[in-house]
Amino acid sequence: MQNKPIPFHISNVNHGLAEVQGLIHIKKNHLILEFEIKDALGGFIKSDLKEIDIPFDEIESLTYKKGLWGASVKIEGNSMRTFEQIPESEQGRCELKIKRKDRNEAEKSISSARVALSEYKLNKLEE
């Protein structure tokens, strides 16, 4: 499964002093979150690029919600460790915001990722 990467952001990191900008890559049996943290004041100070591989085994659910100004992708993991490296994640869940201009492409990609996740879980049950 090769979908176009989905741009995302997480605002109000470190009490509004930083924000996360990144891409969601949807692969056959896993998601890859690639991101960097920037200061919110000018974006001049950046962290190193981080990449987190999340196997479908560690994902409980994947949802997409369209809003008036954008959308959000919510990923729920099987463990708190699944998203421990992602800022603002808590209790094994993370929410990634999608800008309005990217939401239609994101909706298609997340829909196909949900199908792939369901098929993966069904195949695991049959084993």
PLM features: residue spans?
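Histidine- and/or cysteine-centered catalytic micro-motif in compact active-site loops
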Residues: 36-38, 59
